[in-house]
Curated annotation (Swiss-Prot):
Name of the protein described by the UniProt record: Metallothionein-like protein type 2, MT2-22
Family of the protein in this entry: Belongs to the metallothionein superfamily. Type 15 family.
Keywords: Metal-binding, Metal-thiolate cluster
Known role: Metallothioneins have a high content of cysteine residues that bind various heavy metals.
Domain of life per record: Eukaryota
Amino acid sequence: MSCCGGNCGCGAGCKCVGCGGCKMYPDLSFSGETTTSEALVLGVAPSMNSQYEASGETFVAENDACKCGSDCKCNPCTCK
């Protein structure tokens, strides 16, 4: 059986996490009932280029190439 319809996400180390993917944001889910208004506040963080620019290294997200299969196992696990 798939994990919540295959809606799980790959986390650190190419391990599947968040197998409640279909209910990722429970406070914002639609339940068919009348509810009060909700606000989502987004912010912007300052750039940290100065620390890493001098190193000459490029960083790639750890789970960039991972995809979760229907059984909630990362497929393929090609994290770089």
